[in-house]
């Protein structure tokens, strides 16, 4: 069904580029996921990720050519919390794995579908209060409406930044942020997926928390803006699971000689890298994933070969390791029966790929 599996460790931090954004790609088999370098040769930014995804969704294009990072229009005026893990300078050289997963770019004219996992919440909690923003007049009532709302409020913020949400009249009172430490409507609400993740391994922080080291809201606001833009750009060529159902392809057989319809060119799923480490029985705290032995054990748990002795992940919080484990987990989970099933709540709140229903 998929011939590429891309894990993206995300960042909602302010600015055109973030050291915390890292991309890693796996291909079918057991090969260790390999890094995708930014087009600038320096750091990824959210606009560059958006442009890469648009190109990757075109099965006839060589995704090893990420193009030019041109930035996006608008003035970055929001003021959110601090998205940690984005400090430092990324100066190393790496591999653009648009090709065979071994660092060789491909010029094939035909490509299969690509499964992309990104580390942010695709929606806010809904089912606990039957609303994203309980008590707020005009609160969005679907995930697509939520993305549209965030995009409209943040339209003057460049680089898909989402900080304007935290100061928006009405909406800002739901977010715990540096602007609003006493947010009157903030609650530690959890999505059904987060409750399930906690029960089986580990859960992320509340999606309305925009402050501190476990800030989730800043990245999620930026991410929902990007999803909105991807749907506007690509339409049905991209499916956002589980908000849009994905049916696994079945092999052609003599009893069924006609191949089923191809899946969309790209399927986006929500990931939580820490969950994949903890589900493997490993704790990545204090940069443990920088150790080759630790990372090899984690990758092996997801059916992947391990890293070499020269393994040195990028990012101040070894963010590249998060992208790598996610790519390996995507490849493994996508081959698991029932992986595309999700509870009814997921249609409004999203679901973390691989968390048991």
Residue ranges of predicted features:
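A detector of long low-complexity, disordered segments enriched in serine/threonine/proline
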Residues: 95-106
């Amino acid at each position: 069904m998929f011939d590429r599996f891309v894990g993206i460790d995300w960042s909602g931090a302010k600015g055109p580029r973030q050291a915390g954004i890292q991309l890693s790609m796996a291909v079918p088999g057991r090969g260790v996921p390999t890094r995708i370098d930014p087009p600038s040769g320096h750091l990824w930014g959210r606009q560059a990720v958006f442009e890469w995804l648009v190109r990757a969704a075109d099965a006839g294009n060589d995704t090893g050519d990420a193009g030019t990072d041109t930035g996006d229009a608008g003035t970055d005026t929001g003021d959110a919390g601090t998205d940690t893990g984005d400090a430092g300078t990324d100066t190393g050289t790496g591999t653009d794995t648009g090709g065979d997963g071994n660092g060789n770019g491909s010029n094939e004219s035909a490509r299969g579908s690509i499964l992309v996992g990104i580390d942010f919440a695709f929606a806010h909690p809904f089912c606990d209060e039957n609303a994203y923003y309980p008590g707020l007049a005009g609160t969005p009532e679907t995930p697509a409406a939520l993305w549209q709302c965030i995009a409209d409020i943040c339209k003057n913020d460049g680089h898909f930044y989402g900080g304007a949400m935290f100061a928006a009249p009405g909406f800002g009172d739901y977010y715990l942020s540096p602007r609003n430490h006493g947010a009157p409507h903030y609650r530690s609400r959890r999505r059904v997926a987060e409750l399930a993740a906690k029960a089986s391994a580990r859960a992320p922080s509340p999606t309305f928390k925009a402050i501190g080291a476990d800030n989730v809201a800043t990245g999620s606001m930026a991410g929902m803006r990007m999803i909105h833009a991807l749907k506007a750009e690509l339409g049905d060529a991209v499916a956002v699971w589980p908000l849009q159902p994905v049916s696994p392809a079945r092999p052609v057989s003599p009893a069924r000689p006609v191949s089923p319809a191809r899946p969309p060119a790209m399927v986006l799923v929500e990931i939580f890298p820490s969950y994949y480490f903890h589900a493997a029985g490993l704790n990545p705290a204090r940069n443990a994933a920088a150790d080759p032995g630790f990372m090899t054990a984690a990758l092996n748990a997801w059916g992947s070969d391990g890293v070499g002795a020269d393994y040195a992940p990028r990012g101040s919080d070894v963010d590249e390791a998060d992208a790598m484990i996610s790519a390996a987990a995507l490849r493994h989970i996508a081959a698991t029966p029932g992986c595309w099933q999700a509870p009814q709540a997921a249609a409004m709140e999203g679901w973390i790929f691989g968390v048991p229903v």
